[in-house]
Amino acid sequence: MSNILGLDVGSKTIGLASSTGNVAKKEINLKFEEWNFEEGVSLLTEFIKDKSFDTFVFGYPKNMNGSIGERAEMVDYFIEGFMVYNPEIKEEQIIRIDERRTTKMAKSIMIEAGLSRQKQKENKDTLAAQLILETYLEKIKK
């Protein structure tokens, strides 16, 4: 099985999760100045440089009606910058997974686990990335 990185890209954070098999595990949350995607891409590039990821699964936040909205366009913009910084990564290595409701699911999981508001804030993006990656892993299992 391949080495896969799941990503939940926001306006000032990138939650990361990884998998080398059937299970997604949380990695880290990269923080950057709000809307400074060049900084976000740089941090992500630094994170992956000594790792051998061959698939990158980006959460793609479609609107509830399935259309592409501002948040999905933001992810497309981020991916474009990521590929410019990392020309060795090819388009076929980039996967976009519909991530409607993953952040809400992550919050529900953390509330049920009894995490404090501070812990929820710290972990919501990495947990969302883990859920995005698990969605992809389930999809490729079929």
From Swiss-Prot:
One GO cellular component term noted in the UniProt record for this chain: cytosol
Protein origin, superkingdom: Bacteria
Sorted UniProt keywords: Cytoplasm, Hydrolase, Nuclease, Ribosome biogenesis
Plastid among keywords: no
SUPFAM superfamilies listed in its UniProt record: Ribonuclease H-like
GO biological process, one term: rRNA 5'-end processing
Molecular function terms, GO-annotated: nuclease activity
InterPro entries: RNaseH-like_sf, YqgF, YqgF/RNaseH-like_dom, YqgF/RNaseH-like_dom_sf
Protein's cellular compartments: Cytoplasm
Stored Pfam families: RuvX (PF03652)
EC number: 3.1.-.-
Protein purpose: Could be a nuclease involved in processing of the 5'-end of pre-16S rRNA.
PANTHER family given in the database record: POLYNUCLEOTIDYL TRANSFERASE, RIBONUCLEASE H-LIKE SUPERFAMILY PROTEIN
Family per record: Belongs to the YqgF nuclease family.
Protein name: Putative pre-16S rRNA nuclease
Species annotation: Mesoplasma florum (strain ATCC 33453 / NBRC 100688 / NCTC 11704 / L1)
